[in-house]
Amino acid sequence: MLKRLRANHPLVYCLGAVALFLAAMFVGSLLLTLLLLGLAPWAAGPFLAEDFLFQAAVEAIGLAVPLALLWRSGRLGVFARRGAGFLDGLLVGVYPFVWLSLSLSVNLALVGPPEGAAVKAPWRIAAFFLAMFLIGLAEEALFRGVVAETLLAHFGPRRAGVWKACAVSGALFGLGHAVNLMSSEPVGVLIQCCVTAALGMLYAAIYYRTGNLWVLIFLHTLQDVAALINSGLYDGTATISEVVSSFDPSMLLSALLYLLPVFYLLRGSRLPLVAAFWGLDDAPEAA
């Protein structure tokens, strides 16, 4: 059934996948809270002490959605697909890799924690890195492994098709972050949605060019670590919802910085690689 839905109604399939993912995260968060506070209060301590541990558990629940969709549609092999390989794929994604590495360095060395902030216990720092990895794994499995790949198969590997798939998958990636309206200020969430839509286009372009999902999981994890590193290492710093609420219109400049390399990655001379990595027969247009 899922295979037929994906083949015959790909846009409905993608929208449904995103909606199911968000619903699973929301319901999972509520059920986990009820379980910890109602049925197993003895286990609630670590989750109350470290928000990132709770976030990791919720992301693990959300991860079940793309895994189930990939399994039922016979496409769990996306995790094993080598494509261009991890290192060569990272070269394709060198722009965000360098950008994020610099961002991480600046946040660690120049921004730093508030004065007097205490370093968290090792298990809490480990929970932070686990949460960042699970966010990257769950969202990339959904938005690239399920959504972006489905859209590419639908629109095809010609220039117009690749750009349509890239734009729609980016828009869905941005829309998926609207769920933060439940805990953050609307203006900050709107700006986040715009920026992540542009980032989603960049990640889709890298995925189409490399055919390797783990490159995107790595970059996504690095992105979240760079943005939240001080919150992960120190007490008394901003939570995820507070960080999102602090977003202002000046951050829209980063959306442009994410979009510019998309034009380079999807230039005409490189589109044959997209068809090659994905086993699509339709030859792209000449540059």
Please identify what each model-predicted range represents.
Residues 221-287:
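C-terminal membrane module of polytopic membrane proteins
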Residues 129, 133, 137, 167-171, ...:
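Residue-level signature of the transmembrane alpha-helical core
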Residues 1-9:
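Short, Lys/Arg-rich, polar N-terminal cytosolic tail immediately upstream
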